[in-house]
């Protein structure tokens, strides 16, 4: 009996000891994670101000498998039609840091075996600047396991090592493209990460990143070196890449640059020697270059073939980006002129193609000119939509600018004009019933804007519209006008009660005067609008919008009910357009039927909300949204929409349910193409 009691007491003591040890280990784990979370607060970030960081980067590419689909993928055109399978690229640059978030990068030396010294897979550069202590590791993607806000997404295992070091292994609780796996070595007393490894998949790139954090020479919150192994797979194409980046390299001795070739210069900069395989890539490239030069002297290359492959093909399928001016103060960016990846589909407008050109020219640090041509062609409507703003910014600090904008806007309906026309139309005259009440809208706006303070912005200007009947011939047969013109002075004031990060209240007034610059329409309109985005963290936020508008003067049946803050979006632009402030299922004619409107829109966006937790498909979901929209106009009291949306590497999708005056009004799906948007 005594022996059994002694055994029982011993076991209780052992169990209590084990529980105490487990509690101590748990407290150690939590305290270590807290030290990691708080470590950036102990780092002096003023060292970044005015700091120049010299960087060496090497990229080796192996094209394992390729087909015609590789051609239109951004930056892939050169390696898609080249005969070679292996490439190497080296880069030496300097990063001029002004603060922790403001910097410019200047390329000092570059050599590449990619045809015409082009760059490829530039998307990988983002993976070479990880920020482990911030909420997202790479820009606005991939949640860091070492930020307090992401603690709920990861599991951790700890192993105590010697010399005050701890090995931490981490993996996500659910498989998702926004989460990573890996391990790091951490100083247990400070929470400082020394080196480690992470792996994940994002935007069709599977990657493994080995990194060493910087010593005190730079800053312990930025890496000293990164080695990236990546694989890109898409519709039968497989491309592997090895990317190395070394930060804190010695500054370039400019006195010795002039006498060296670019290859010799890179040999003198490189932190170590090339491998046998890398040297072989260079040797094969220069041998082929010499052979092409010899053959060119004997056989004149077909001009048509060179133009098609080297000029036309590249510019048609790839983005064009270039600097110009004596000091490279100008920059132009052109989306592909013809690339099937920029196609889209909308139920009302059918298939459409989007096109975008941006131009920026800096006259000084405070003055610049910005222009952007954004266009889209609807094949169903046989209509080219475009907007062309030309902005001259004269005071960068106060966002002072003068803007001239041209555009042809949406098709706008006018049922009253249609009824008048049909009453005058000879009987038995055929017409297109689907298009008869629509008018094309060409508009011209001239306005000036100035931020008088962080609370007040004032805008004044004029806006003109010329609206022409889509079925112009039918209106001519009825002997009624086919076009109408309005010219309106306008004023707008934006009030931010708490400054830039709070809500913005907008009051807009517009008055068209008959006879002003040959205008034949008169109206007066007032709109109120309030918008706010509440950011809970880097990837989770709530956006809210509410507003109303009404016509105080409406002269005759020939006028058009058209609002600035309540209008149809003619060319949808995917996840990053105004999905958070528009009505997805509302037929387009409702935007132009009422002399008033009252609307509210709210959207909640976050990763890992619902579908992300479903096996197999959840791993591909990047972000998710919940939508709620409500509208009051004539004959709609109210119109409501609720929806759920998500975005993946391929498409963004939204499912919406509409109710009209309390009754079910339908279900709809909206799809936007996201493929290679970030490339």
Stretches with model-predicted labels:
Residues 157-158, 163-261:
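Gly/Pro-enriched, hydrophobic low-complexity segments
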């Amino acid at each position: 009996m005594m022996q059994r009691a002694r055994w029982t007491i011993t076991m209780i003591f052992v169990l209590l000891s084990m529980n105490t040890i487990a509690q101590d280990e748990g407290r150690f784990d939590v305290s270590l994670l807290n030290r990691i979370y708080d470590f950036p607060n102990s780092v002096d970030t003023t060292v970044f101000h005015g700091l120049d960081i010299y960087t060496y980067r090497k990229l080796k590419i192996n094209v394992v498998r390729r087909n015609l689909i590789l051609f239109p993928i951004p930056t892939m055109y050169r390696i898609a039609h080249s005969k070679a399978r292996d490439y190497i690229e080296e880069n030496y640059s300097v990063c001029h840091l002004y603060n922790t978030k403001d910097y410019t990068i200047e390329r000092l030396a570059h050599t590449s075996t990619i045809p015409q010294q082009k760059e490829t897979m530039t998307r990988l550069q983002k993976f070479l600047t990880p920020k482990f202590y911030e909420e997202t590791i790479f820009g606005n993607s991939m949640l860091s396991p070492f930020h307090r806000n992401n603690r709920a997404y990861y599991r951790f295992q700890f192993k105590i090592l010697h010399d005050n070091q701890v090995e931490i292994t981490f993996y996500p609780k659910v498989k998702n493209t926004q989460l990573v796996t890996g391990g790091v070595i951490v100083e247990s007393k400070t929470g400082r990460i020394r080196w480690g490894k992470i792996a994940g998949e994002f935007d069709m790139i599977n990657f493994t990143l080995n990194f060493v954090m910087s010593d005190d020479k730079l800053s312990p919150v930025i890496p000293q070196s990164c080695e990236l192994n990546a694989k890109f797979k898409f519709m039968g194409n497989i491309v592997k890449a090895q990317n190395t980046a070394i930060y804190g390299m010695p500054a370039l001795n400019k006195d010795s640059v002039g006498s060296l070739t670019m290859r010799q210069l890179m040999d003198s900069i490189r932190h170590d020697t090339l491998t046998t395989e890398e040297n072989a890539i260079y040797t094969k490239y220069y041998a082929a270059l010499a052979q092409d030069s010899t053959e060119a002297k004997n056989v004149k290359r077909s001009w048509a073939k060179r133009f098609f492959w080297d000029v036309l093909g590249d510019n048609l399928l790839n983005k064009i980006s270039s600097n110009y001016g004596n000091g490279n103060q100008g920059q132009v960016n052109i989306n592909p002129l013809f690339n099937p990846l920029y196609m889209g589909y909308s139920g009302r407008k059918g298939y459409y193609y989007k096109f975008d050109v941006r131009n920026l020219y800096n006259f000084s640090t405070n003055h610049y000119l910005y222009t952007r041509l954004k266009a889209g062609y609807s094949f169903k409507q046989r209509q080219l939509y475009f907007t062309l703003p030309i902005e001259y910014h004269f005071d960068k600090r106060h966002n002072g600018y003068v803007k001239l904008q041209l555009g042809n806007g949406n098709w706008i309906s006018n049922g009253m004009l249609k009824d008048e026309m049909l009453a005058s139309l000879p009987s038995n005259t055929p017409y297109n019933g689907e298009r008869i009440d629509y008018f094309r809208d060409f508009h011209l706006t001239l306005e000036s804007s100035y931020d008088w303070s962080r609370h007040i912005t004032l805008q004044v200007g004029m806006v003109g519209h010329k609206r022409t009947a889509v079925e112009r011939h039918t209106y001519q047969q009825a002997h009624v006008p086919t076009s109408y013109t309005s010219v309106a002075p306008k004023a707008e004031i934006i009030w931010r009660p708490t400054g830039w990060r709070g809500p913005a209240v907008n009051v807009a007034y517009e008055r068209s005067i008959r006879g002003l610059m040959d205008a034949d329409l008169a109206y007066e309109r007032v709109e109120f609008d309030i918008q706010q985005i509440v950011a809970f963290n880097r990837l989770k936020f709530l956006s809210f919008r509410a507003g109303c508008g009404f016509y105080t003067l409406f002269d005759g049946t020939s006028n058009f009910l058209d609002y600035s803050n309540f209008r149809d979006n003619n060319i949808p632009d995917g996840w990053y357009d105004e999905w958070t402030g528009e009505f997805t299922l509302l037929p387009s004619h409702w935007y132009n039927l009422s002399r008033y409107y009252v609307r509210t829109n709210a959207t909640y966006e976050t990763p890992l909300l619902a579908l992300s937790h479903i096996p197999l498909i959840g791993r591909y979901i990047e972000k998710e949204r919940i939508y709620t929209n409500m509208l009051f106009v004539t004959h709609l009291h109210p119109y409501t929409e609720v929806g759920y949306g998500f975005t993946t590497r391929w498409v963004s999708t939204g499912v919406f349910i509409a109710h009209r005056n309390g009754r079910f009004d339908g279900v709809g799906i909206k799809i936007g193409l996201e493929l290679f948007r970030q490339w």
